[in-house]
Amino acid sequence: MTAPILKVQGVSKHFGGFTALSEVSIVIAPGERFGLIGPNGSGKTTLINCISGVLENDGGRIVFDGHEISRLAAYQRTRRGIARSFQIPRPFHSMSVLENLLVPLAFVGRGSRAEADEILRQIGLADKAATLSSRLSQVELRKLELARAMAARPRLLISDEAMAGLSGSEVDEVLKILFDLNAKGITIIMIEHIMQAVMRFSQRVICLDAGRIICEGTPEAIVKNGDVQRAYLGA
């Protein structure tokens, strides 16, 4: 049996008297496409912040590739193979697309133009390499955000609302990129409010509500679950 790439074991997070996560446990297999859904305030962002190292969990353990990483800084987790794209892209607007990619490559100890060119080709931004990031469209900014995450050569990529605000055809573009990256062996956690995108992409989905997992299963099972409909869809 293949060992999981990520185990979240009884993770809790508190902000003062508020419990954002309450003993959340998930296990993700290498190469899996994993969806994370839930209403606003359900704990999705807190969970991925704990996984990526932006926040330190108050209870429980986070194990990546067989090693506990609960107390590692975010940059240490990145170097171990966890990367994340953020919901709101914040590129260096005075830099070109290529320069924006060379910065994270240098951070992880590589600055190869050839590697940057290959990432841009994979993401679909090769023809925008010399373009200032301030001139990019919304979907191009989302692609650049994914490219910057790929600079870390991740084994686990967390895609945080990469399709928010995009048109249907643009959502299809981003989904194709994520499918292609997954086909190369990258495990992907997708956090997304666009339910159709999550259901098309994910092999397995969990739904959070009030910091707890209320349902876990296939996309088909999730959309039919009464608890999910009440919590996430307002039914």
Model-derived regions, located:
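Glycine-rich phosphate-binding loops of nucleotide-dependent enzymes
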Residues: T2-A235
